[in-house]
Each structure stands twice: as structure tokens, then as C-alpha cells.
């Protein structure tokens, strides 16, 4: 079965748990996106995991990072929802 590319925004406790679960099931390749390089460094490298330091406030960069993914999941505070949704629409990915 081909793995679906999925982006997760937010590498805190919730985002990391979602990431680990999706990687463990074997159906997804995960791009974990966070504005904090330090936060991403805390997460061990795993097959199928790509980590990207990126701020969702960078609309163009974030939109470009989402392209080619099946969907994006948010594990960020509620006030980031609009920015993530706009980038998902622009990149034509599910949110």
C-alpha cells in the first residue's frame, strides 16, 4: 500500500502524539512542521518522518510546504486556524 503524505502543524505534546500514532500505523509519511527548531530536535528521527522549521505566518512558505500532501492536521492553538486553513485551500490539501 502506498503511504499518503500528511502534514502536522505543531510539534508539542499533541502534535507529537498524533505523529507517532500515524507513523506507527504505516499508512502515512508525515511532515511535522513547527516554528521552533528546538521543539523539533526533541523528536527522534524515524523512517517516514520529515521535520520542517516553518512559521505558519509565512503564508507563501507554508503553502509551498503543504503542496503534495494529502492533508494537513493542526495541533496548534485555535488562533492559528485561519492561517492554516487559508494555506490548505491555496495548496489544495484537506484540512
Positions of predicted regions on the chain:
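Short acidic/histidine-rich motifs immediately flanking catalytic phosphotransfer sites
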Residues: 46-47, 66-71, 91
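Conserved N-terminal Rossmann-fold NAD(P)-binding element of oxidoreductases
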Residues: 6-10
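Short beta-strand element of Class I
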Residues: 29-31
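Hydrophobic/small residue at the entry helix of a nucleotide-binding pocket
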Residues: 14-15
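Aromatic pocket-lining residues of Rossmann-like dinucleotide-binding sites
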Residues: 22-23
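Conserved Rossmann-fold cofactor-binding substructure of NAD(P)-dependent oxidoreductases
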Residues: 53-71, 75-76, 80-83
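Beta-strand-loop-alpha-helix segment that lines the small-molecule cofactor/substrate pocket
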Residues: 85-95
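Helix N-cap at the beta1-alpha1 junction of Rossmann-like dinucleotide-binding domains, i.e.
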Residues: 36-39
